[in-house]
């Protein structure tokens, strides 16, 4: 799956055509009020660009929340239609379903350039292919019904544009099931693919990956794949304690220890050695007597270790210097997972100083990519999203890319001729 060879919305001729755009309008709602419209704002460049090309109409489709394959007004996209109208400064026609005769009729009789927003795709079990009931029991969708649902979506479109990178790791009907001749990436999706291609397909070296997070077992595939690509690897966050205990028999007190992940540590270290990857682990820690923002604070290093009843919640000043030196050498940086419990101010210094180093690196022209999830939250919290090369919008999707997996929503896009 080449990331850099996918058709872009700019490669299309959409004049006079029905353009189906899969967007990610999965916004947080408080009742019917949108509490953060960032995802809607992020889709505007693609929508406006297509609109300028004078299409017959634009059909916007998204999911919202987890309605589990049935209609649930709590997850209606109606509030999104109102917000989108405000942001675009023009009428958006909200349709009460995403398939069916009413939808077909509305799209067929569209006036020039009309913008439609379909109701939540996940009101149909055929979008995800399965659903869970309230007891967590899974029901699979009938394959014939899925096929029909995909055909109904396809019948609305002459051209397909996907701008929902955050859902690209899901083989859902709206992501992979529209069989139209041209399937292109929108601007958001294109930017994600462009930056991940810069890191994973053709990185400027030295290439540094920074990994945080709690469990080694969650990141084994990620570490294993990156050890084939990077020159340096920082392992921080909670999972560093599993490495330190296994490799140096360091006492870790009540810090996180991942029994399952521990079995893989020596193999990963051996692979790093074999591939000449410099593995960088913290050497000192900021510790706490409990997992709490008001905890007592102390320090420890890897010579004496962390005493009983204490836990490491951040990396200490020597570790920060080690990490800063690695960042200063790197020309390409991918960062997934913070090195400390940044949600508590007393244990945020390691994350904040690493972020400052990353911003400095980006400012002198290096490629600095932040994977989605917690690390993206950190970049937002400290207001530096615009100072980094790229902050991914897709936590799960970016993680799977870094693990070396194919993303169904990307594979389904047309390649450039």
Curated annotation (Swiss-Prot):
Role according to the record: Catalyzes one of the two ATP producing reactions in the glycolytic pathway via the reversible conversion of 1,3-diphosphoglycerate to 3-phosphoglycerate. Both L- and D- forms of purine and pyrimidine nucleotides can be used as substrates, but the activity is much lower on pyrimidines. Negatively regulates the biosynthesis of acetyl-CoA from pyruvate in the mitochondrion.
Pathway: Carbohydrate degradation; glycolysis; pyruvate from D-glyceraldehyde 3-phosphate: step 2/5
Lineage summary: Eukaryota, Fungi, Dikarya, Ascomycota, Saccharomycotina
Subunit structure: Monomer.
GO-annotated biological processes: gluconeogenesis; glycolytic process
Organism encoding this protein: Candida maltosa
Classification via PANTHER family: PHOSPHOGLYCERATE KINASE (PTHR11406:SF0)
Pfam family, one: PGK
Protein name as catalogued: Phosphoglycerate kinase
Disulfide linkage: none
Gene behind this protein: PGK1
Any one of the GO CC terms: cytosol
Entry similarity comment: Belongs to the phosphoglycerate kinase family.
């Amino acid at each position: 799956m080449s990331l850099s060879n996918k058709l872009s919305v700019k490669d299309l001729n959409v004049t006079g055509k029905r353009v189906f755009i899969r967007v990610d309008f999965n916004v947080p709602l408080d009742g019917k009020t949108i509490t953060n419209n960032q995802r809607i704002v992020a889709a505007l460049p693609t929508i406006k660009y297509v609109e300028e090309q004078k299409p017959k109409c634009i059909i916007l489709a998204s999911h919202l929340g987890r309605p589990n394959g049935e209609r649930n007004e709590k997850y209606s996209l109606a509030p999104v239609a109102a917000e989108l109208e405000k942001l675009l400064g023009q009428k958006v026609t909200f349709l009460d379903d995403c398939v069916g005769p009413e939808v077909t009729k509305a799209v067929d009789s569209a006036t020039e350039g009309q913008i439609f927003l379909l109701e939540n795709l996940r009101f149909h079990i055929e979008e995800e292919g399965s659903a869970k009931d309230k007891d967590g029991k899974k029901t699979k969708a009938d394959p014939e019904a899925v096929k029909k649902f995909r055909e109904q979506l396809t019948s609305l479109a002459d051209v397909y544009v996907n701008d929902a990178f955050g859902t690209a790791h899901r083989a859902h009907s709206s992501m992979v099931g529209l069989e139209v001749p041209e399937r292109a990436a929108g601007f958001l999706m294109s930017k994600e693919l462009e930056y991940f291609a810069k890191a994973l397909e053709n990185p400027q070296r030295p290439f540094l990956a920074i990994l945080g997070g709690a469990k080694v077992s969650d990141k084994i595939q990620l570490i294993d794949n990156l050890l084939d690509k990077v020159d340096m690897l920082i392992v921080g966050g909670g999972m560093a304690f599993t490495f330190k205990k296994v490799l140096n028999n360091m006492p870790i007190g009540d810090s996180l220890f991942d029994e399952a992940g521990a079995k893989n540590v020596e193999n990963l270290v051996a692979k790093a050695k074999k591939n000449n990857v410099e593995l960088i682990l913290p050497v000192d820690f900021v510790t706490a007597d409990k997992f709490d923002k008001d905890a007592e604070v102390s320090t420890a290093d890897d010579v004496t270790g962390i005493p009983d009843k204490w836990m490491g919640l951040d990396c200490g000043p020597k570790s920060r210097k080690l990490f800063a030196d690695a960042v200063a050498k790197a020309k390409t940086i991918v960062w997934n997972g913070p090195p400390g419990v940044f949600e508590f101010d007393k244990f945020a210094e390691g994350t904040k100083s690493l972020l400052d180093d990353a911003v400095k690196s980006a400012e002198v022209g290096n490629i600095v990519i932040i994977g989605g999830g917690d690390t993206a939250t950190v970049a937002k919290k400290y207001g530096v999203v615009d100072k980094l090369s790229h902050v991914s919008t897709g936590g799960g999707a970016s993680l799977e890319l870094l693990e070396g997996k194919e993303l169904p929503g990307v594979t389904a896009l047309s390649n450039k001729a």
